[in-house]
Design a protein with these regions (language model features):
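Short, Lys/Arg-enriched N-terminal segments with co-localized hydrophobic residues
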Residues: 3-18
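Portal/gating segments that form or line small-molecule/metal binding sites
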Residues: 19-163, 176-242
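Short hydrophobic/aromatic-enriched beta-strand-loop microsegments
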Residues: 165-174
Length: 242
């Protein structure tokens, strides 16, 4: 694929409205998303605490990932590290009819990489994105369909958040502090508030949050029990319950 040009892939089941972009992320209480599934999954930066989600898995985990994540996908967008991690596992997965395997192996995929050739990136229908990622993802979102889903893909997820391109954030939060590793949000993240669409707590202690971004606001909690909120330079007073 030529740099700066997106080859649009048609999926037969797509709806007519433009696709939404969602981030679907496993995250710890301290915001780490690196190497959740295994010690050697992602050791970049000297990360030694991979596999941190495994002790906390429960029966609801699989249902959430299947029914509330992948069931909404019409296309998948991945960074290089996540692509390289997923491809050997899911391409050889024993039951290719399971939902996650079917989506990852047969649905349109977009890979962000300036180094892999199209031949090296061969995994079902995969298009390599090179050059201006933000503008090319913006163009992909104009295709009809349900969701263009990002899974993992730390650097890509941060880039899309900071560009304001993410429509839905699905965060599966695990009750563990990892203490080191790549974080979804850091001191350079675009300030953003969120509307909670839904939240689910599982028996094993997982919390599934579905969030939509809204405008960041700040305020001043005053001594007289009111708070002054400021949004776009406009002050709004509200009473704080005692």
């Amino acid at each position: 694929m030529v740099q700066g040009v997106i080859e649009l892939v048609t999926h037969p089941d797509r709806k007519e409205s433009p696709m939404k972009l969602s981030l679907n992320i496993f995250v710890s209480l301290d915001g780490v998303m690196q190497g959740p599934g295994a010690p050697q999954e992602d050791t970049t930066g000297g990360f030694t605490r991979g596999g941190w989600l495994v002790p906390h898995l429960d029966e609801e985990f699989g249902r959430i990932v299947d029914e509330e994540w992948f069931a909404h996908a019409d296309a998948v967008l991945l960074g290089r590290t996540t692509f390289d991690m997923m491809r050997p596992y899911w391409s050889a997965y024993p039951n290719q009819e399971e939902l996650v395997a079917r989506v990852l192996n047969t649905f349109p995929k977009y890979l962000v990489s300036d180094t892999l050739t199209d031949e090296q990136a061969a995994w079902g229908p995969t298009t390599v994105i090179r050059g201006d990622v933000v503008e090319q993802v913006r163009a992909i979102k104009q295709q009809p369909g349900r969701e263009l889903q990002v899974h993992g893909s730390w650097q890509l997820a941060q880039t899309l958040h900071n560009a304001g391109l993410v429509d839905t954030y699905r965060l599966l939060v695990f009750p563990v502090v990892v203490g080191q590793g790549k974080r979804l949000f850091d001191e350079h993240s675009r300030p953003t508030a969120f509307r909670t669409v839904s939240r689910t707590a599982t028996a094993g202690g997982l919390t599934h949050l579905v969030l939509e971004p809204t405008e960041f606001t700040s305020g001043d909690l005053t001594a007289d029990g009111t708070t002054d909120l400021e949004a776009d330079g406009t002050e709004v007073s509200a009473t704080v319950p005692a």
